[in-house]
Amino acid sequence: MTDSTPLDSEFLNQLTATIEKNLANEQFGVSELADALSMSRSNLLRKVKKASNLSVSQLISQVRLKRGMDLLRSGSHNVSEVAHQVGFSSTSYFIKCFREYYGYPPGEVGKRNINQEPIPVAPPPSNNKK
């Protein structure tokens, strides 16, 4: 994250909450987020980049992948169920994005130390294909 102000943090919290409300909607992307926040697309892109140093697509992917990690760590869902719950219509694409972000496939989550906080190894993919 960049040198963010309290306003940036508040904005990012609002964004994250809005994304989480629409998590299962695979069609929820940049335009839908801008509409939900009553902002222009260009203003949203600029503010997100300033507040997080990520693109809007990357931020949406990051929220989806982190929620996916939470669901996998709970142990009550398989990878395919989690992929669909966090807005990926393709399980294989979820696995690809997860592996790029965390450095290991989602099937290994249960085998890893559950007390250790997962550390992303790369920024989330900016391509919002599912």
Predicted segments, located by residue:
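Short, Lys/Arg-enriched, Trp-marked, Pro/Gly-tolerant hinge/linker segments that flank
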Residues: 1-13, 35, 50-58, 62
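Basic, amphipathic alpha-helical hairpins
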Residues: 16-28, 48, 52, 69-78, ...
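Basic/polar phosphate-binding segments, predominantly the helix-turn-helix DNA-binding elements
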Residues: 30-59, 83-108
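Terminal helix-turn-helix DNA-binding modules in bacterial transcription factors
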Residues: 50-89, 111-130
